[in-house]
């Protein structure tokens, strides 16, 4: 009694379609999809940059250690 039944959801969906129309809803859906794709692409680009930064940081640390060892030997 206190919950939302399937018929209540059907009526709500029909009202939304009548108010906004299918063109606006279709446009809204495609805009939302493009936004999600852009967000995922940005996250993947960020991961690639982080991995590249870690490689550079590791090389720098190795060269610093190597220079320190050379100074100790000299």
UniProtKB/Swiss-Prot annotation:
**Segment forming the signal sequence:** none
Query: Which keywords are on file for this protein?
Result: Cell inner membrane, Cell membrane, Membrane, Protein transport, Translocation, Transmembrane, Transmembrane helix, Transport
Residue stretches spanning the membrane: 1-21
Query: What's its membrane topology?
Result: Single-pass membrane protein
- Subunit annotation: The Tat system comprises two distinct complexes: a TatABC complex, containing multiple copies of TatA, TatB and TatC subunits, and a separate TatA complex, containing only TatA subunits. Substrates initially bind to the TatABC complex, which probably triggers association of the separate TatA complex to form the active translocon.
| NCBIfam families registered for this protein in UniProt | PRK01833.1, tatAE
This protein's source sits in the domain of life called Bacteria
Query: Which GO terms of type biological process are on file?
Result: protein transport by the Tat complex
Q: Which GO terms describe its cellular component?
A: TAT protein transport complex
As for subcellular location, the record says: Cell inner membrane
Q: Which family does it belong to?
A: Belongs to the TatA/E family.
What is the stated purpose of this protein? Part of the twin-arginine translocation (Tat) system that transports large folded proteins containing a characteristic twin-arginine motif in their signal peptide across membranes. TatA could form the protein-conducting channel of the Tat system.
Origin organism of this chain?
A: Glaesserella parasuis serovar 5 (strain SH0165) (Haemophilus parasuis)
What name is this protein filed under?
A: Sec-independent protein translocase protein TatA
Database matches in Pfam families: TatA_B_E
Give the molecular function GO annotations.
protein transmembrane transporter activity
Q: Where is this region: Disordered?
A: 51-74
């Amino acid at each position: 009694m206190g919950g939302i039944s399937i018929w209540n959801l059907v009526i709500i969906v029909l009202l939304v379609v009548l108010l906004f129309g299918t063109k606006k809803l279709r446009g809204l859906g495609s805009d939302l999809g493009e936004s999600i794709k852009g967000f995922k692409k940005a996250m993947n680009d960020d991961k690639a940059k982080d991995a590249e930064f870690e490689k550079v940081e590791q090389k720098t640390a190795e060269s610093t250690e190597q220079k320190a060892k050379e100074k100790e030997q000299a």
